[in-house]
Amino acid sequence: MYNRLSVTLFIFAVLASRSPVASADSFGDIFAYKVERSRSALYDGRWDVYLTGYAWHAPYAYSREKRDELNDASLGGGLGRSVVDANGNTHSLYGMIFRDSHYKAQYTAGYAWMTYWPAAEKLDFGLGYTVFLFARSDIGKYFPTPLASPIASVRYGSFELMATAVPGIAHDSGNIAFLFARWNPRYGN
């Protein structure tokens, strides 16, 4: 079920996008477009700085005792590169390291796509998705594991507060809202 949910979220986000991908003829066209955008972010993009901060563990998925043991302060950071396409969508490659729920290092690297709607001067709301690999001690002893998740954001100038949801596959696993920030000097100059 977990893998089906991740694949469904990824496909929905791609098909709902306001990019040329929405009218692509095949999955191969979509994949080729995303590879080209990733390559563009890597070589032509601007640097991003990420700061991680908070992980909310859903009360319905964890006992009170378990939640008291878990780390909510997911402190860490990372770097990335982003490029904006002709439609105003942002394509990003990133890597982050932060303390996981068990106070151990978690490594994450991936691709993110975001689209934005203006709300006021310099204020935008965004929705998108991320496809990434993560490695942590309690899941495969740091063996890289793939995941796809939705992202929501509020961007003001060059600063962006972002949130993603990590779905659960069992009791005491997943069901986390993860908050982090991104600063990109490209915006709000």
PLM-predicted stretches and their roles:
Residues L51, G77-R81, G95, A109-T115, ...:
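Residues on the lipid-exposed face of transmembrane beta-strands in outer-membrane beta-barrel proteins
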Residues G45-L51, H91-L93, L123-Y129, L161-A163, ...:
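Transmembrane beta-strands of outer-membrane beta-barrel proteins
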Residues W47, A73-G77, H91, A105-Y111, ...:
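Hydrophobic, lipid-facing positions within transmembrane beta-strands of outer-membrane proteins
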Residues A55-H57, G174-N189:
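Outer-membrane beta-barrel "beta-signal"
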Residues M1-R39, N189:
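Cleavable N-terminal export/targeting peptides
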Residues S23-R81:
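Short glycine/proline- and aromatic-enriched beta-strand/turn motifs that initiate or cap beta-hairpins
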Residues E36-R46, V84-T90, Y116-G126, Y187-N189:
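Short loop/turn motifs that connect adjacent beta-strands in outer-membrane beta-barrel proteins
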Residues E69-N71, N87, I97-T108, A135-T145, ...:
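Solvent-exposed loop/turn segments connecting transmembrane beta-strands
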